[in-house]
Amino acid sequence: MNTTHVKLSPAVLLTFVLLLCNLSAIARPQEKIKKKEISQSYSVSAGDRLQVENRYGNITVTHWNQNTVAIRVEVECKARSEERAQENLDRIQIETKKIGGIVSAVTTIKKEMNSNSNNESMTINYYIQMPPKLAADLNQKYGNINLPSDNNGNMDIHVKYGNLNAGNFTANAMIEAKYGNIEVGNLQDAQLDLGYVGTAKIRNAKDLTIDSKYSNLDIQDIQSLRMEIKYGNLTIESVSRLDMEIKYSDAKIGTLKDALNVSSLSYSNLKIRNLSPSFSKVNVESHYGNLEVALPAKTSFRIVAENMKYSSCDVNGFNITRKHFDDEDRDKNYTYEINGGKQPTIHFEGNRYGNLKVKANKSVVEAGHAPSLQPDIFILRCFAGVSLLSSTSYRVV
């Protein structure tokens, strides 16, 4: 029996593959698209406010020098048939109005009657032009909020399952972000509510209040911060005053200039790479948490560590002028006077299982870096760490 082998050239094989792909595309129903656009403008004055609620799209704001809010909404629906795409388009209603000093735009989606919605999608994008100082409430679900480089009005922002990209806020700001990322510039007086935020980047801030859960924050410079963080990570390059609760988290501070109060350091780690010699106080209460502090060797201060029964208290690199160890009732209390100092004080409540480490920073000569670097930048690189000078990406867990 003779067997004939047919050898196909690469060109023939490629033609055959392309033919199969084309046949597959022909067999698959073509996607149909239906669109509509809504535009409306309203005159506004000082004291007025904009309110927007949207889903399945983005809110993009730009500023102009007119006393008018211009709202343009682009709606697009995709489906396997034109009829089905049109049905979905008709389900989406955009209501805009002005009552008193409130300009509002709300997306409403009627309930779907047919549960078979495979290969169907909708996109609802808002494009808003408004005066820079107009106050605004923006609420976006399943999409992003994009704001200009400078925002001068009071802002109330809610974004879920999406990202916030914004510049500076010169007025009060309230930001709620869940299941996304945020990146903002400078903040004056702001409150942040964060949940499952992969990366929250803040450039500079004057006064911040943050409630963070399962989120990661990166802050460059801040004057005053009140914060509760659970199950996350915090990196701050420079801060003056901190009042915190840290639970099941890791926190790193580059430079602490003035005061720190941690009411609960629970199952967490807090590291301060450069405590200013002019600091006023450091108070930390630990519940299975660890504190590490570094400051210049010639700083005059005191260390008080209490209830350290099963804990470690490590102090090194300083001129210890007085040390007292009290093991009455087996609580193990430590007191150190560094360079003759009685104030200010690093006070650490170990609650038996928290660990404290206080060490002297290395001098510029010991660090061995190039002398051409500026002193302030040089010290930051030595003591704050390179990780604080570079962006860090985190993955949502």
What does each model-identified segment do?
Residues M1-G385, S391-V397:
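Intrinsically disordered, low-complexity terminal regions
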